[in-house]
């Protein structure tokens, strides 16, 4: 906030104005996403971590999800609202190139990996002619999944591997256990009666007021 920056007495606050606005008012959806992703990269996060934060999987109800990955998503959900698109995003920082589909999965993203080390991704197959005999691998991005190529390693990194590595870098589960506060954790003031505590006409009045 501009007012907060103007009244800040710390030396670092003199430099904060150069960061804003992160998103220009007339920016498109794609431009806004690009601006926030670049901002997160400049803050020290890796490309993969930033994209995982911005376009998470549907983790809340997935009982089969690895606990470390669930902890990563839950912790970062307090920092970043999900960009649910619908969107299929392609990204690169010169060291990696990848793509991710938002968790609703409404944008088709199909890919070919050829035997002569080419990768082709588009909304539909056939955008670029590929000899079937030259196809090493083909598939489509699944909702919330990431497709990532590491230029330095020269390989395609599976979604499960890259997210496992990112999720294990910090003790997100410990942080949640220590710092997460839910409504059930907040003590009820002694002078406030809940609907369950009231009876008779008092209960009826409280229900009317609540309605």
Residues covered by each model-derived region:
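Single conserved hydrophobic/aromatic residue that forms the stacking wall/gate
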Residues: 1-8
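Conserved mixed alpha/beta core segments that line enzyme active sites in large multi-domain catalysts
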Residues: 9, 36-39, 43-150, 163-165, ...
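Glycine-rich phosphate-binding loop plus the immediately following alpha-helix
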Residues: 11-45
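Low-complexity, flexible helical/coil segments
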Residues: 26-31, 126-128, 181-189
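Extended, highly charged accessory segments
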Residues: 54, 64-67, 77, 100-102, ...
